[in-house]
Design a protein with these regions (language model features):
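Soluble FAD-dependent oxygen oxidases
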Residues: 1-331
Length: 331
């Protein structure tokens, strides 16, 4: 194991990650390689009255750590057992590793739309996969959790017999947003289909996936900029890594989202004065939760909590909770 203090060569690299707007500011970094190293790091923190925080990829950085940072990226072994259809992933493993090792066996994990996200961090937040409505939360599939205190050193979880999926995306110019939002909202959604709606500046993007066939014709309510839908290997639906960048974001879980409210949210996001991208995922199906929708906001800059809160004000009376995932650079 390597240990880094401020000023050491490698300290900056070790505390950096996908989020470039914020970095951890630890007194010491334990770059762990096994569970015994994690024990040592936790012991160091506890005996000195310091906080300890885990850093894997930095995708989910909320508040920068100031005490002990446990960097897990070297502790990233993944083992697949095709007989029992299980995977064991160490603390630093990312989904791409699991997908690559599982797919030759016709198996797949319940990973999300970015394959470079950490398996453990994602799963601890429930894990909304690209097939979430068909198969439930990633955390529903956990068989065994190995821990040192509150630090998960490895997870063992079920893989699913998934090879090909029906998946794709439609992109529209934002000038058609009202019609696209309406078509998305009125979709008589089969329980096996997992869709998302995302705004990205001038574009509204719809994505959808299932292991079973389904129809998206009714979503083509305006000319499409991208129209891609078909049968493909699960890995292709599992998202490509993005380059590191600066972003701030938060989310709410809702128990209803009437169309007029959705339109007000859309307008509030587009009138926020700063870029606010909106993400909407209908829940239900195999996701056993009282919430019917997950609404996410994300901006490519920091210091926009107030603008996000003003957009969330439009849905305040429907809020029943918040997902631990999809919270970025917020305390
Ligand atoms: C581009 C992008 C796409 C995403 N897509 C999805 C998606 O499709 N579905 C979804 O559900 N989520 C998604 N997320 C959210 C993601 O799952 C969370 O941000 C998650 O916390 C990232 O975990 P990490 O380990 O990669 O990040 P890190 O920033 O390294 O860790 C985040 C936090 O997770 C906890 N954590 C991580 N590892 C451990 C451990 N071993 N023991 C204890 N705690 C630990 C810690 O609290 C840590 O601070 C996405 C995020 C981004 C930025």
């Amino acid at each position: 194991m390597r240990i880094f203090y401020p000023g050491d060569t490698g300290y900056d690299d070790e505390r950096s990650g996908f989020q470039t707007g914020l970095r951890h500011e630890p007194q010491v970094i334990f770059a762990v390689e096994n569970a015994r190293d994690v024990e040592q790091a936790v012991h160091h923190a506890e005996t000195r009255g310091l906080d300890h925080t885990v850093h894997t990829t930095g995708h989910g950085l909320t508040t920068p750590a100031t005490g002990v940072l446990i960097s897990t990226r070297r502790m990233n072994n993944v083992e697949i057992d095709p007989t029992t259809r299980t995977a064991r992933a160490e603390a630093g493993a990312v989904w791409q590793q699991v997908i690559e090792q599982a797919s030759p066996h016709g198996l797949a994990p319940l990973s999300g739309d970015a394959s470079d996200v950490g398996v453990v961090g994602y799963t601890l937040g429930g894990g909304f996969s690209v097939l979430a409505r068909e198969f439930g939360f990633a955390s529903d599939r956990v068989r065994k959790t190995e821990k040192v205190g509150d630090v998960v050193t490895a997870l063992e979880f079920d893989l699913l017999e998934i090879d090909q999926v029906h998946a794709g995306e439609l992109h529209f110019d934002a000038e058609h947003a009202e019609a696209v939002f309406e078509a998305f909202h009125s979709w008589d959604l089969p329980d096996h289909v997992t869709p998302t709606l995302t705004t990205l500046g001038d574009v509204v993007r719809l994505t959808f996936a299932s292991t079973r066939p389904f129809d998206v014709d009714h979503l083509r309510v305006a000319p499409t900029l991208i129209d891609e839908f078909g049968r493909k290997p699960f890995a292709e639906a599992a998202g490509k890594p993005l380059p590191p960048h600066t972003y701030q974001g938060d989310n709410v879980l809702l128990d209803d989202l009437p169309l007029d409210v959705l339109h007000r949210v859309r307008q509030a996001a587009s009138n926020a004065g700063v870029p606010v991208f909106l993400g909407l995922m209908p829940l239900g199906g195999a996701l056993k939760t009282e919430a019917t929708h997950l609404l996410k906001l994300i901006s490519p800059l920091l210091g926009v909590e107030q603008q996000h809160e003003e957009v969330f004000d439009e849905v305040r009376s429907f809020v029943v909770g918040r997902s631990r995932n999809f919270r970025y650079a917020v305390g």
